[in-house]
A protein has these predicted regions:
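Short, Gly/Pro- and small/polar-rich lid/capping loops
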Residues: 1-10
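Asparagine-centered strand-capping/turn motif at beta-strand->loop junctions
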Residues: 16, 129-135, 247
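Beta-strand-rich interaction surfaces with strong enrichment in secreted/lumenal proteins
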Residues: 114-116, 277-282
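Active-site/ligand-binding surface loops and adjacent short beta/alpha elements
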Residues: 148-237
Length: 297
């Protein structure tokens, strides 16, 4: 049975469910910023993505170790995680999963994944993925976050979804691939951000083709904010090549900001797991750490 652990620092609180090691609340002075999982739109909050981000073609791939067969975004989000540490001051918590006979049927590699959530500032949550190769062959994988935030944000008064924008740290041009109807990624009909822009307005229609994926974002920083109030969230994701931005259908009142090291299979790729673009390869005994942080505005 899953349990929820709450960490605190001043007026900032975060709650994490051991099922999937998923963040389920992020509140400042009692004001909830994290999407609360209304199933009418999307029944999750902030799943962790491992050992894949997005989908494999037909949910399967071959590898040197055998067949990989798993659902969209991988296995970590759908299993119970062990609580291994809570800091003395109650401001951080670490969870762990390892491979099991069941996981090896879907992903035939040995691993350990530690997830640490830490409140590192008066309004900042830091999330760290630590992946260790516990096997004797190279471990291929991707990791990612999927936190979704309420739009409008707390304190936004009369703002609407259409009053929100994505702000970059400098002017920038980006061509973003889109998701095909069969769940693959393509540059055919890709989304192109306005040239030399540091602000991108969003509407519900921005997500008609699923997530928008930005590559090599300036400063590895992206801010989701209301144009009138300035309220929202800033995400810093150095070490993650991509940031996905997504909202659900039917005018869902949230936006997910998703740091990824990899992404769903491209329509031009083959079905060998190790060939997936930007897959991390970890030698036996090595550990890879990736961190992103969310600051509430």
């Amino acid at each position: 049975m899953s349990t929820v652990t709450t960490i605190k620092r001043g007026g900032l609180t975060a709650a994490i469910d051991s099922m999937g090691a998923q963040l389920t609340s992020l509140a400042l002075n009692g004001n909830e910023y994290l999407w609360q999982g209304d199933p009418a739109f999307w029944g999750k909050h902030a799943p962790i993505l491992f050992p894949i981000v997005g989908s494999l073609r037909n949910n399967t791939a071959t590898s040197a170790a055998g067949t990989c067969e798993m659902p969209r975004h991988g296995l970590a989000r759908i299993v119970e995680h062990k609580l291994v540490e809570v800091s003395e001051d109650g401001s951080s918590v670490t969870y762990e999963i390892t491979d099991t006979p069941e996981s090896l049927k879907a992903f035939p590699f040995h691993f350990k994944l530690n997830m640490t959530y830490a409140l590192t500032g008066d309004a900042t949550l830091t999330q760290t993925f630590a992946v260790t190769n516990t096997g004797d062959v190279d471990l291929p994988f991707s990791v990612g976050g999927h936190p979704a935030f309420n739009v409008p944000a707390p304190g936004a008064d009369d703002e609407t979804f259409e009053d929100y924008e994505l702000a970059f740290t400098e002017t920038w041009t980006n061509e973003a691939p889109i998701i095909t109807p069969d769940g693959l990624m393509t540059f055919e009909g890709s989304y192109k951000a306005p040239d030399n822009s540091d602000v991108l307005p969003i509407t519900h229609r921005s997500f008609d083709n699923d997530a928008i994926m930005f590559t090599d974002t300036p400063g590895s920083t992206l801010t989701l904010r209301g144009r009138k109030s300035g309220h929202g969230v800033k995400i810093d994701f150095e070490g993650f090549k991509y940031i996905g931005v997504w909202s659900a259908a039917n005018d869902a009142p949230f936006v997910a900001l998703e740091p990824w090291t990899g992404h769903t299979t491209m329509d031009t790729e083959d079905d060998v797991f190790e060939h997936k673009v930007n897959t991390i390869t970890l030698a036996p005994g090595e550990t890879d750490k990736r961190t992103f942080s969310v600051t509430l505005l």
